[in-house]
Amino acid sequence: EIHERLVGSEMCIRDRTRRVDSLGRIVIPKELRRMLHIKEGSPLEIYMDADETIVLKKYSQVGSLKNISQAYAQSLSKVTGAMVCVADRDEIIAAAGKNHKNYIGKALSKELENIMDKRKSALYSKKDDTLIPVVKDDKADCEAQAIAVIVHDGDSAGAVILCVYDEKADKSEIAEKLAGAAAEFLADQLG
């Protein structure tokens, strides 16, 4: 039985007491995992507050590279003229170029999450009518998209997305290669 109450604008959830099993595991209720978008195998940080409260926090491998991701996105955008986004598994953590402020901190679209789950890079274009929304409520108004998944230790850790707006230049192939280079670079930074 889960009890919910609103505190300000945040939802607080109280659950019955949980026991630690013989292997040191604690079960996180399904409703809480669903609300927080915690999937099976999602990395979590565990630490203790000053008042000896155990805190579990979603861990973003790519999020730990936020500063370097922002610098890389700016460089890539400057070179290609494309809007560049770097995403972890949940949101856009860095962006540069046209309309980039509309993307930073926004939750990823289901379509982008599916691409990341498949761990395959992809190229989409307006003329082929294959563009996908990058974030929820995105209109996908660019000419082409190159999406390269950041794979670390065999798992999808995030993605690099290039959105090309110049319809005259056929930069899609170049954009795909650059997005792949960015993904490789960021995967190497993860260790």
Give, region by region, the residue ranges found by the protein language model.
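A generic structural motif
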Residues: 33, 99, 163-164
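Intrinsically disordered, low-complexity terminal regulatory regions
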Residues: 17-94
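Short, small/polar residue-rich loop motifs at catalytic or cofactor-binding pockets
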Residues: 13-14, 78-81, 142-144
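A short beta-strand signature within small-molecule sensing/ligand-binding domains used
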Residues: 133, 139-151
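Structured interaction and signal-relay segments at domain junctions
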Residues: 73-137
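Short hydrophobic/glycine-rich mini-motifs in sensory/regulatory modules
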Residues: 52, 150-160
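Juxtadomain coupling helices with adjacent low-complexity linkers
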Residues: 66, 70-75, 108-113, 158-191
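Single conserved hydrophobic/aromatic residue that forms the stacking wall/gate
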Residues: 1-13
